[in-house]
């Protein structure tokens, strides 16, 4: 897996669409790509797509339609996968955002900041590389905990 992750990082760092852009408004102090699964993907990006498709299929099979559940009441009959890459500068971050057409979203980290290893061992409170779902107060006025 380490070799795959290294290859994926190199693929992203050399992707022709990786750039600083105001169009990608949720990336702060970092660069983002356009759609990676646009039909031209190859190498590690193609392998990533295959893994995601398999996992999404497994997830859907394990969570059948349930009319009494808000998430499972209307699952898609078929799905497609969209993907983009983000590379952050020091202290870069992803701003609060949402994926309106998405039924299911996920994140894959092929590389992590070194500080996360120390944080996992309880040696630092540095939040570099962390992810949090559900907190949207600065855009929507919601101050509740996720």
Regions found by a protein language model. Give the residues of each.
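Non-heme Fe(II)/2-oxoglutarate
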Residues: 1-72, 93
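Catalytic core of non-heme Fe(II) oxygenases with the double-stranded beta-helix
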Residues: 37-47, 57-146
């Amino acid at each position: 897996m380490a070799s795959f992750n290294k290859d994926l990082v190199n693929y992203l760092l050399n992707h022709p669409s990786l750039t600083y852009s105001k169009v990608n408004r949720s990336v702060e102090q970092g660069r983002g790509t356009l759609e990676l699964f646009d039909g031209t993907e190859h190498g590690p990006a193609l392998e990533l797509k295959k893994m995601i498709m398999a996992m999404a299929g497994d997830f859907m099979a394990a969570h059948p339609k349930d009319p009494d559940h808000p998430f499972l009441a209307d699952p898609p009959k078929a799905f497609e996968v969209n993907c983009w890459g983000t590379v952050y500068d020091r202290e870069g971050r992803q701003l609060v955002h949402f994926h309106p057409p998405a039924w299911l979203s996920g994140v894959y980290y092929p590389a992590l900041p070194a500080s996360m290893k120390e944080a996992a061992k309880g040696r630092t409170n540095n939040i570099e590389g962390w992810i949090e779902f559900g907190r949207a107060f600065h855009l929507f006025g919601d101050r509740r905990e996720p």
